């Protein structure tokens, strides 16, 4: 690649074209710099996508410690190029472009596992990555990383702790009720069945914070969105402390 760059320069090619000869191999290791010029990025990604999809198409995958075709390195290179250049692109779409009969979902899973290893070295917890992966199937790697780091920073704050405790309290009651009633409470509650002031206040808080949460998510301000969710802890606590969940009236109990 380096020699190719020299030859291309001597042949009169522009520098950004000549540099592609060496840049499309990058990064060769976890500490190597990634390509950052548009042409080099495109060719480097295409090279790695072609390598991965081609080997997946013939069912040649890394097993254990064996990786004779350096596919883990190709996957890590693809991940780093996307993340470090903040490229907003669908992983499924770009893998489909190079698909020669490869199992795209299996290849995505492999790439996600490599990304977990890469991010673990940056002190990001696996369970946080898994939580973010569950939301949108991890198609946008750059966005996934932003969400994961925002979540990690948030849960270490008092607001984060409040949010988790509020969720646990509500979720435990729901799980127990679903088990006892044999139904799934996935539908929303209806304000018209709210009898107590704490119930009505909780509905108001939910509606109020939902507007803020949606706005924050549209701006990809995930910390702001989670702060708004954490604001629900107080009305949730008051609801649990002052309202009898297990009402004698069945429709009221189910709504609560």
Describe the function of each predicted region.
Residues 1-256:
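Amphipathic alpha-helical "coupling" segments that flank catalytic cores
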């Amino acid at each position: 690649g380096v020699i190719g760059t020299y030859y291309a320069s001597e042949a009169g090619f522009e520098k950004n074209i000549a540099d592609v000869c060496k840049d499309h191999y990058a990064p060769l290791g976890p500490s190597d710099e990634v390509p950052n010029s548009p042409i080099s990025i495109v060719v480097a990604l295409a090279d790695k996508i072609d390598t991965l999809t081609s080997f997946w198409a013939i069912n040649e995958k890394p097993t254990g410690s064996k990786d004779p075709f350096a596919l883990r390195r190709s996957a890590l290179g693809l991940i780093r190029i996307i993340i470090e250049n903040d490229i907003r692109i669908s992983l499924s779409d770009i893998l489909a472009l190079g698909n020669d009969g490869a199992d795209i979902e299996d290849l995505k899973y492999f790439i996600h596992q490599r990304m977990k290893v890469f991010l673990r070295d940056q002190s990001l917890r696996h369970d946080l990555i898994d939580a973010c992966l569950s939301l949108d199937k991890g198609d946008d790697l750059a966005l996934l990383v932003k969400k994961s780091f925002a979540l990690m920073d948030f849960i270490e704050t008092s607001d984060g702790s409040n949010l988790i405790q509020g969720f646990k309290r509500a979720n435990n009651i729901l799980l127990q009720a679903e088990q006892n009633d044999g139904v799934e409470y996935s539908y929303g509650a209806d304000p018209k069945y709210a009898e107590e002031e704490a119930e009505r206040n909780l509905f108001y808080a939910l509606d109020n914070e939902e507007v803020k949460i949606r706005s924050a998510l549209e701006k990809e301000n995930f910390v702001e969105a989670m702060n708004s969710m954490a604001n629900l802890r107080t009305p949730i606590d008051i609801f649990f402390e002052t309202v009898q969940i297990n009402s004698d009236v069945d429709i009221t109990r189910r709504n609560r």
